[in-house]
From Swiss-Prot:
Organism expressing this protein natively: Mycolicibacterium smegmatis (strain ATCC 700084 / mc(2)155) (Mycobacterium smegmatis)
Role played: Toxic component of a type II toxin-antitoxin (TA) system. Upon overexpression causes bacteriostasis. Its effect is neutralized by coexpression with cognate antitoxin PhD. May bind the 30S ribosomal subunit. In M.smegmatis 3 TA systems (VapB-VapC, MazE-MazF and Phd-Doc) may be involved in monitoring the nutritional supply and physiological state of the cell, linking catabolic with anabolic reactions.
Consequences of knocking out this gene: The phd-doc operon is not essential. A triple TA mutant (missing vapB-vapC, mazE-mazF and phd-doc TA systems) survives antibiotic challenge, suggesting the TA systems are not required to generate drug-resistant cells. However the mutant is more sensitive to oxidative and heat stress, and does not survive long term starvation during aerobic growth on complex medium. There is a difference in the level of branched-chain amino acids, which may play a role in monitoring the nutritional supply and physiological state of the cell.
Encoding gene (name): doc
UniProt keyword Iron-sulfur, yes or no: no
Gene Ontology MF annotations: kinase activity
Assigned keywords, A-Z: Repressor, Toxin-antitoxin system, Transcription, Transcription regulation
Name recorded for this polypeptide: Toxin Doc
Location of the Fido domain: 5-126
Record-linked InterPro entries: Doc, Fido, Type_II_TA_Toxin
Length: 130
């Protein structure tokens, strides 16, 4: 069974990544981003794989700008918190520069979910990518 984050989980992860208290600009956008990984269509998961769910969360948080500042950092932290509580670890030696590039791409361009999911899987510890 997949475990999901709630609003407070996302804000906590984001505050840690941001290094201070986050200011929410729009709670509706924040709640929509938090709910997106759980979306279903006619009772079927809209995002069936764990990587798809994490990508949906990351994309929505990075692009919706629900926060005054720290949207990309919160998106990264929330996606990896979500993956962590579902048994996936971030590789200790992940490419920080590539992660930063990914977040900038997601925030400023139309990145499809499959590409984001594949990138996230590439950052996972080797034994976790299956």
């Amino acid at each position: 069974m997949t475990e999901y984050l709630d609003r407070e989980d996302v804000l906590t992860a984001g505050s840690i990544a941001f290094g201070g208290e986050l200011k929410v600009r729009d709670y509706g956008l924040l709640d929509a981003a938090v709910a997106r990984p759980q979306a279903t269509v006619y009772g079927v998961d809209a995002y069936p794989r764990l990587w798809d769910k994490a990508a949906a969360l990351l994309q929505s948080l990075a692009r919706n700008h629900a926060l005054v500042d720290g949207n990309k950092r919160t998106a990264w932290a929330a996606a990896w918190t979500f993956l962590h509580i579902n048994g996936v670890q971030l590789a200790a030696d992940f490419d920080v520069d590539r992660a930063e590039d990914l977040m900038n791409e997601v925030a400023t361009r139309d990145c499809d979910l499959d590409s984001i999911a594949a990138e996230l899987a590439g950052f996972a510890a080797a034994a976790q990518t299956g």
